[in-house]
């Protein structure tokens, strides 16, 4: 019974945070990019549309979880948090639109990326 309650609470939290409206806490909304110049690049060298807000990082998933349900962002795919060396190796390209903005503040507890938001490059 407790396991079901925990899973349902986690699923509700993912449903609320994984699919925000046009503007989000991670800065991937269209309104955020209106004030930047056309040659704006993030710290990782990605293009203007691939920047994440302060406190979040670009993650690249190596397996496709786009067709999965709400828990696909938590359980599906194998995502790597972006580093400068990873982006230079991948040349800012992730397979099959599997790019996400994930929070970068890890507090040592169960660190699943439940709040990762898909972004288009």
Curated annotation (Swiss-Prot):
Disulfide feature: 52-101, 60-94, 61-79, 102-116
Residues spanning the signal sequence = 1-18
Q: In which tissues is it expressed?
A: Expressed in conidia and aerial hyphae.
Its keywords, alphabetically, are: Cell wall, Disulfide bond, Glycoprotein, Secreted, Signal
Origin: domain of life? Eukaryota
Glycosylation site list: 83
> Where does it live in the cell?
Secreted; Secreted, Cell wall
What does the UniProt entry report for the null mutant? Does not affect the ability of the fungus to grow in vitro on agar plates or in liquid culture. Does neither affect mycelium growth and sporulation, nor the frequency and speed of conidium germination. When the four class I hydrophobins (hcf-1 to -4) are partially silenced, approximately 10 times fewer conidia are produced an the germination efficiency of conidia is reduced by about 50%.
The induction field says:
Expression is increased during sporulation. Expression up-regulated by carbon or nitrogen starvation.
Q: Which family does it belong to?
A: Belongs to the fungal hydrophobin family.
Q: How does it assemble?
A: Self-assembles to form functional amyloid fibrils called rodlets. Self-assembly into fibrillar rodlets occurs spontaneously at hydrophobic:hydrophilic interfaces and the rodlets further associate laterally to form amphipathic monolayers.
Question: Which purpose does this protein serve, as stated in its record?
Answer: Aerial growth, conidiation, and dispersal of filamentous fungi in the environment rely upon a capability of their secreting small amphipathic proteins called hydrophobins (HPBs) with low sequence identity. Class I can self-assemble into an outermost layer of rodlet bundles on aerial cell surfaces, conferring cellular hydrophobicity that supports fungal growth, development and dispersal; whereas Class II form highly ordered films at water-air interfaces through intermolecular interactions but contribute nothing to the rodlet structure.
Q: Mind telling me what this protein is named?
A: Class I hydrophobin 2
Gene expressing this chain: hcf-2
